[in-house]
C-alpha cells in the first residue's frame, strides 16, 4: 500500500469487544482527529508490515526532512545534497531499522546524530560522502551494520577508536581507505589492512603531542635563559658605567691639594 505525499495515515488500533460502547466511540474519535504521521511532501511513502517505508532518494534535498512518520521502519535518503547529520536527527523514529544516506555530500556528523535509534537501527549506509572523520560519540551503542566506504577519511587516533567499535559491512570494509594520514605512507591504503598490520595511530598521536610539549618547554626555557643573560649583561654594563663615573670624580687628595693652593694664594 502506498500513500501520496502529504497524506495523513492512521494507525490500526485494536479495540477489545468487551469495552463499553462510549469508550469505543471516544477512542475512535481520538484516532480520527489525531493523525499518526504525514508523509513528507518531497518523499513517497509505502506500508510494510503495518509500518512505513519513506522513499526520499534523488529529491535534491539539502537536509534531513524534520517531520518524518513516527512509525518509519525504512528511510531512504540516498543521492541528495545533504551535508550534515545534526544532533537527534532521528529521535522521533523508534522503529527505524534501515537508514540509507549514501551518495550525499555529508561532511559533518554531530555527536548525538543517531541518539534515539541506536537500539533499533539494523543497517546504516554512509558510503560515498565527504566525511574525513567522526566523533567517537556519534556511533556509541550503535549495533547496526554500517557502510563507510568511499569517503575521504583522515586516518588518525580518533578514527581508529571509532572503527574498532563498529560492525562494518564486510562487503565494503576494504573500500574504507585512508585518503590522508598523520603518517603519509598509509595514504591510499585500506584502513582495516593498516590496523590489522599492527599500526596504532594513537601512538603517533601521543608521540606528536610529546614532541610538541618538548618543543614548547624548550622554547620557554630558551627565553628564560636569554632573559637571564640579558639581565646580567645589562647590570654589568650599568656597573661599568657607574665605576667609570666614580673614576672620573677628583680624588680626596687632589681636592685637599687644590684647597691648600687656594689658601696660599689668599
Swiss-Prot record:
The chain crosses the membrane at residues 211-231. InterPro entries: Leu-rich_rpt, Leu-rich_rpt_typical-subtyp, LRR_dom_sf, LRR_TM_domain-containing, LRRNT. It is a single-pass membrane protein. Residues 39-70 form the LRRNT domain. One of its GO terms (cellular component) is membrane. Residues 1-38 form the signal peptide. Residues 151-204 form the LRRCT domain. It is found in: Membrane. This is Leucine-rich repeat-containing protein 3. PANTHER family: ANTIGEN BSP, PUTATIVE-RELATED (PTHR24369), LEUCINE-RICH REPEAT-CONTAINING PROTEIN 3 (PTHR24369:SF170). Belongs to the LRRC3 family. LRR repeats lie at residues 71-92, 95-116, 120-141. It comes from Danio rerio. Its main location: membrane. It comes from the Eukaryota. The gene is lrrc3. Keywords: Leucine-rich repeat, Membrane, Repeat, Signal, Transmembrane, Transmembrane helix.
Amino acid at each position: 500500500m502506498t500513500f501520496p505525499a502529504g497524506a495523513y495515515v492512521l494507525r490500526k488500533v485494536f479495540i477489545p469487544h468487551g469495552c463499553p460502547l462510549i469508550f469505543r466511540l471516544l477512542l475512535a474519535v481520538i484516532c480520527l482527529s489525531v493523525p499518526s504521521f504525514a508523509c513528507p511532501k518531497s518523499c513517497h511513502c509505502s506500508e510494510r508490515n503495518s509500518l512505513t517505508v519513506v522513499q526520499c532518494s534523488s529529491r535534491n534535498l539539502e537536509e534531513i526532512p524534520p517531520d518524518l512518520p513516527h512509525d518509519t521502519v525504512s528511510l531512504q535518503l540516498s543521492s541528495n545534497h545533504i551535508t550534515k547529520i545534526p544532533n537527534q536527527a532521528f529521535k522521533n523514529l523508534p522503529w527505524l531499522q534501515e537508514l540509507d544516506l549514501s551518495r550525499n555530500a555529508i561532511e559533518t556528523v554531530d555527536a548525538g546524530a543517531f541518539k534515539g535509534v541506536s537500539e533499533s537501527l539494523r543497517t546504516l549506509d554512509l558510503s560515498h560522502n565527504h566525511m574525513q572523520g567522526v566523533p567517537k560519540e556519534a556511533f556509541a551503542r550503535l549495533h547496526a551494520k554500517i557502510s563507510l566506504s568511499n569517503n575521504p577519511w583522515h586516518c588518525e587516533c580518533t578514527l581508529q577508536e571509532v572503527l574498532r567499535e563498529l560492525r562494518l559491512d564486510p562487503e565494503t570494509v576494504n573500500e574504507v581507505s585512508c585518503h590522508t594520514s598523520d603518517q603519509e605512507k598509509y595514504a591510499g591504503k585500506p584502513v582495516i589492512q593498516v590496523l590489522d598490520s599492527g599500526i596504532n595511530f594513537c601512538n603517533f598521536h601521543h608521540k606528536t603531542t610529546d614532541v610538541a610539549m618538548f618543543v614548547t618547554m624548550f622554547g620557554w626555557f630558551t627565553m628564560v635563559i636569554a632573559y637571564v643573560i640579558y639581565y646580567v649583561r645589562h647590570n654589568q654594563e650599568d656597573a661599568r658605567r657607574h665605576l667609570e663615573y666614580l673614576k672620573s670624580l677628583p680624588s680626596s687628595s687632589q681636592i685637599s691639594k687644590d684647597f691648600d693652593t687656594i689658601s696660599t694664594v689668599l
